[in-house]
Amino acid sequence: VLLSIEDIYNQHPEFEKAKIIERLVEPDRIFTFRVTWVDDKGEVQTNLGYRVQFNNAIGPYKGGIRFHASVNLSILKFLGFEQTFKNALTTLPMGGGKGGSDFSPRGKSDAEIMRFCQAFMLELWRHLGPDMDVPAGDIGVGGREVGYMFGMYKKLTREFTGTFTGKGLEFGGSLIRPEATGFGGLYFVNQMLQTKGIDIKGKTVAISGFGNVAWGAATKATELGAKVVTISGPDGYIYDPNGISGEKIDYMLELRASGNDIVAPYADEFPGSTFVAGKRPWEVKADIALPC
């Protein structure tokens, strides 16, 4: 990231005098807290929660909340740093931030996830607000989890404000929010190819993952005339030389909606496709690779 701004930085000695880089690489503040919740067996569980408010030079802190066993402060600091630049590139008045917990929603009931989200928000709510810090979803946090957190935020603040993005439509969310990131990624890829005089039609695309981003990317890639040949999950990846589109995408959405985030059943459902266990799809030859 820093290499990408090196030339501009060196053209402005006033940046060095003001120690802009030194100020950019450390967050404004970090909140670390214990999240105590009760599982379905009535046993008390404890996780760590974080919110990194990285930089608000051009607007309120903005960045997702991630629930995954791998979450730690180091990862969130880097993601918050990166988010600051990503948000600045939109030209919208948004700063950068990131948050999350080492809680994993996998294998948890809806009631357990709801109780955790409410306990998480019980610790974080006072540091959020439409003009202060506006979280969103990320890995392990979709519309359901955002809804649980926003519901608790409303209860605690007694206000209905634009403090979360990624909400469901019933909470004032955007109509195409689930697809938006994947769609945007493909528009960007298509624009890059066009600057080189390359047509995306007929190109093969390898995609990792099959969450909201990968779903949107696969859908838009197909609409633009490309052929998506891989998707992946925690169990491995699917290679489908015939292309992953239409009813195949619908099938994966139904599989995921059932709470099953593995991709192996795809190979049983659609002859001609191959499931490769325990690997990521980058060994597959393709014109475009999209880590989603």
PLM regions: where:
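Glycine-rich, N-terminal phosphate-binding loop and its surrounding beta-alpha-beta segment
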Residues: 31-105
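Structural motif
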Residues: 50, 93, 100, 131-133, ...
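Ligand/cofactor pocket segment of small-molecule handling proteins
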Residues: 282-292
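Short, Gly/Pro- and small/polar-rich lid/capping loops
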Residues: 1-32
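Structural signal for hydrophobic packing residues in well-ordered secondary-structure cores
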Residues: 5-13, 80-88, 117-132, 150-161, ...
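Glycine-rich phosphate/diphosphate-binding loop of Rossmann-like nucleotide-binding domains
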Residues: 165-168, 173-282
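Glycine/serine-rich phosphate-binding loop and adjoining beta1-alpha1 elements at the start
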Residues: 68, 87-201
